[in-house]
UniProtKB/Swiss-Prot annotation:
This is Small heat shock protein HspH. One of its GO terms (cellular component) is cytoplasm. Belongs to the small heat shock protein (HSP20) family. The keyword Lipid biosynthesis does not apply. Transmembrane segments: none annotated. It comes from the Bacteria. Residues 28-138 form the sHSP domain. It comes from Bradyrhizobium diazoefficiens (strain JCM 10833 / BCRC 13528 / IAM 13628 / NBRC 14792 / USDA 110). Keywords: Stress response. CDD domains: ACD_IbpA-B_like. The keyword Transport does not apply. The gene is hspH.
Length: 151
């Protein structure tokens, strides 16, 4: 896999740090795909992230909301060593980060049937929402014509 060094670009740009972080994150995206997840659009301003983390308990998983990101970490508690004939359920530690768009916030998280469901909502401030501006017509009969002078 080819890697790129973006440090020369950081020296000459201002305010684009998040853009370069997203590029680096996309570059590392193919490295690990555990745990599997779905991202659903529930309604126009509501989303849900579902992570399949069978074998983990809610105490072994943490969800952290940061600015424009939500981080899910899991670490299985060490228990007595067992002898497995076949081990198909992974219990390895993981860390998964999801980058969020502006104004998207974590509303809640729930653990149900081996799935961690994280509810997201997009709340755009009133000042940022589009609004319709009424167009007033000029009253008729108030048009004044200027007299032209000969040059």
């Amino acid at each position: 896999m080819r890697t790129y060094d973006f440090s020369p670009l950081w020296r000459s740009t201002i305010g684009f740090d998040r853009l370069f972080d997203l590029v680096e994150t996309a570059q590392r995206a193919g490295e690990d795909n555990y745990p599997p997840y779905n991202i659903e659009r529930v309604s126009e301003d509501r989303y849900q992230i579902s992570l399949a983390i069978a074998g983990f308990s809610p105490d072994e998983v943490s969800v952290t909301a940061e600015q424009n990101a939500v981080i899910v970490e899991g670490n299985k508690a060490d228990k007595a060593e067992r002898e497995y004939l076949y081990r198909g359920i992974s219990a390895r530690p993981f860390k998964r980060q999801f980058n969020l768009a502006d104004y998207v916030q974590v509303q809640s998280a729930a653990f149900e049937n081996g799935l961690l469901k994280i509810e997201l909502i997009r709340e755009i401030p009133e000042a940022m929402k589009p609004r319709r501006i009424a167009i007033n017509a000029a009253p008729s009969g108030t048009v004044h014509q200027l007299e032209g002078r000969a040059a």
